[in-house]
Amino acid sequence: ALNRSESYAFLINNDGTIAVFYSIRGDQKAGWTLWDTQGLWHSICAVHERLFVVCARDDGSGTTKLFLEEFQDDMPMDFCDTFSGSASVFGSLTSHFSNNAVVKATNGNDFLGTFTVSGGEIDASAVKSGLSQAFIGYSFSPTLKTLPIDATIQGGPLTGEPRQIPKVVLDLHSTLAVSVQGPSTTSTSRDLVIRNTTDTVTGGFMERSAVTGKEEFRLLGYSRDPRVIVSQSFPLDLQINGMIVEVAF
């Protein structure tokens, strides 16, 4: 999971979150981020390029248990695994989840939905038929929040003045779902769930294709400390290479 040129430091906080320090020495760049999960991180260990964690979480049984987990780039959710099934019914989940666990499921470029494990299985046939494999786990919401967007004009800086963010342009790579919110956390979030399709029909459905390129979002409202909050509502692929923000006053 960490076969990368950057340097990392992982610190377990008292509240069960992980503070992650990220550094690229050659470019003189560094920063912090916070990792959260549906449960509490207990301890963490790196073995060469692999990262393991002990997490205290409820698997649906109503009892908090300790699980040894590994971070992997190809898993779209926490406490996630690949499960086989037939006709979009995925059974034998009790090896991972207890009955009554509320989980999310994805298949390829599709978000199948939120399900409650019952009888050791979930049934996604009403969403998409004919599936034999799916990722099932607990989703998390990646969130990127900018500092207050400021600008300097001929009369001086706009700090403290009511400002609007009418437009945000994201430079996306292989992205299937993203949402943009601003100028404050109470503003309406603008979701982009990719609907591009290929000409290939699988199981009666046109397959979606990820978007690479620049996508524009229009926002409403004013704030004295306008920010842009980027997140997503569905556990699908998301990569942001850059952001352009337009400020009006």
Question: Model segments located where?
Answer:
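Beta-sheet repeat architectures centered on beta-propellers
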Residues: 1-249
